[in-house]
Amino acid sequence: MHRIAVVPGSFDPVTLGHLDVIERAARMWDEVHVLVVHNPDKSALLPIAQRVALLDRSIEDAGIAGNIVASWSVGLLVDYCTDIGAHVLVKGIRSQVDVAYETPMAIVNRHLAEVETVFLLPNPANAHVSSSLVRQVASLGGDVSPYVPAAVSELLSSS
């Protein structure tokens, strides 16, 4: 049986914490779709196509590209999972706040399409990193290179 997982997120921008979760998921499943999804509750810094391109480059640069596909969707996440035959969502969880936010969605996803959600704890080195923190530091001219892949750091430092 070919096991497919989806790692969804806004990835605005992709961080080293995201790459850690993606890499670990790629070791656990045969195929991993890293899915850039539109979050109506967030104001995007980067267009979706640019986020997918940054994911592709970051995954390639990290040397973990073998069984990983970067894509995007604006529809219902479980519909994407059904379309590709995935039964698992993988989410990184940094704190109780993330657990409280993700748990109701995990329950609904299981109800809608029998898609399970697996939570991965962060590497301690990345536990404090979030895309919103990166955006804030970058907007104030700070160095984000310790928190993001080189492609993202280059883009944000040139903006």
Swiss-Prot record:
Location (main, coarse): cytoplasm
Molecular function GO labels: ATP binding; pantetheine-phosphate adenylyltransferase activity
Class in the EC hierarchy, top level: transferase
Superkingdom, taxonomy of origin: Bacteria
Pathway annotation from the record: Cofactor biosynthesis; coenzyme A biosynthesis; CoA from (R)-pantothenate: step 4/5
The entry's keywords: ATP-binding, Coenzyme A biosynthesis, Cytoplasm, Magnesium, Nucleotide-binding, Nucleotidyltransferase, Transferase
Summary of subunit composition and partner proteins: Homohexamer.
GO biological process assignments: coenzyme A biosynthetic process
Protein name: Phosphopantetheine adenylyltransferase
Similarity section: Belongs to the bacterial CoaD family.
Pfam families recorded: CTP_transf_like
Cofactors that this protein relies on: Mg(2+)
